[in-house]
């Protein structure tokens, strides 16, 4: 798996307050558009955090089922890229500032999927923060990122990761 390090502020490991592990997936629909979401003003690929009892793939398959209502199998997804993102002065939900290391395992689905809106089970946080699914081409996603004027300061971090992913995709 290709490994990319984003560390614009040159943080050292000993400066990190918290390390988080997440997993996300590049899912394509029948039109070759990428399925992503807007959550609290941030554009993200489908996925989320890895719970203590889960493997990375198990967490991803659970998140796919919850967020788009589709059941995939371990064999339907393959490794794409690992991003280690050092985040200086990251604003937390309780209004404190932390230096984070976000390690995100990105996968790509070998299967085209269709969102099953009637099977989606969002968390209370996702409902509260206006979780919304979007289907767009890589070019359209880059425009969404460029024109995103959210007040959520975390959006810049997600934008950096999504740009790294889009650069590596072989679709327009």
Briefly describe each language-model feature range.
Residues 29-32, 110-115, 138-139:
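Short loop segments at secondary-structure junctions
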Residues 85-120, 134:
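Active-site-adjacent beta-strand/loop module that shapes the phosphate/pyrophosphate-binding cleft
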Residues 1-24, 28-30:
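Acidic, metal-coordinating catalytic segment for phosphate/diphosphate chemistry
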């Amino acid at each position: 798996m290709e490994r990319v390090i984003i560390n614009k502020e040159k943080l050292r490991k000993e400066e990190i307050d918290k390390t988080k592990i997440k997993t996300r997936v590049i899912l394509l629909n029948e039109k070759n558009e990428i399925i992503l979401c807007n959550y609290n003003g941030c554009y993200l690929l489908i996925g989320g955090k890895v719970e203590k009892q889960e493997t990375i793939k198990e967490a991803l398959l659970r998140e796919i089922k919850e967020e788009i209502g589709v059941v995939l199998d371990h064999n339907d997804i393959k490794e794409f890229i690992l991003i280690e993102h050092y985040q200086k002065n990251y604003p937390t939900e309780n209004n404190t500032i932390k230096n984070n290391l976000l390690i995100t395992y990105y996968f790509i689905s070998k299967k085209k999927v269709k969102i099953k809106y009637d099977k989606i089970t969002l968390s209370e946080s996702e409902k509260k923060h206006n979780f919304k699914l979007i289907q767009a081409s890589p070019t359209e996603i880059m425009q969404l990122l460029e024109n995103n004027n959210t007040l959520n300061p975390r959006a810049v971090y997600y934008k950096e990761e999504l740009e790294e992913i889009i650069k590596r995709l072989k679709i327009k």
